[in-house]
Amino acid sequence: QWAIFLRNHDELTLEMVTDAERDYMYEEYARDPVARLNLGIRRRLAPLLDGDRRRIELMKALLLSLPGSPVLYYGDEIGMGDNIYLGDRNGVRTPMQWTGGWNGAFSTADPERLYQPLISNPVYGYQAVNVESQRRQENSLLSWTKRLIQVRRSTRVFGRGSIEFLRPANHRVLAYVRSLGAEKVLVVNNLSGTAQAVE
């Protein structure tokens, strides 16, 4: 099986799409030209989706329910942000945010000696978004992600099953059946920003 991922340490490349599709992607996900690199977008998952918890959960649900070996980029399990003002691709390669303490508990070195500076903005900074604080919250993104991973691990069909895409009349809904032997799981994803009817 192939590895599948939502984001990684490189830019989201748009070199294989049409100019119109690239313009749409820039308008939706990289209005600030600083977020663009070459023909791509250099953002982590959470800021790419404007920190919208529902959209982040949807993307992870897709990642963990579709065929392939899912790969989470470090920090995406907690909704870690980026620093697009660092050069090249370094904005998505900042230190892991373990705690809200010194250097996010990534290192005991002086902050200026770190290879990359920690994210320090109020929305995604290590004081606001870190593993330690999310471990204590049952409804945190980290806890939600761990539960979803457990569902995937305990449901064999997600790891090895076939997939059959359904064609609901409502095009805002992506539905498919994962099957392995007698085991079948119906997966229904609402791709819109509002509640949707599905048959």
At which residue positions do the language-model features occur?
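Active-site and adjacent substrate-binding regions of carbohydrate-active enzymes
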Residues: 1-199
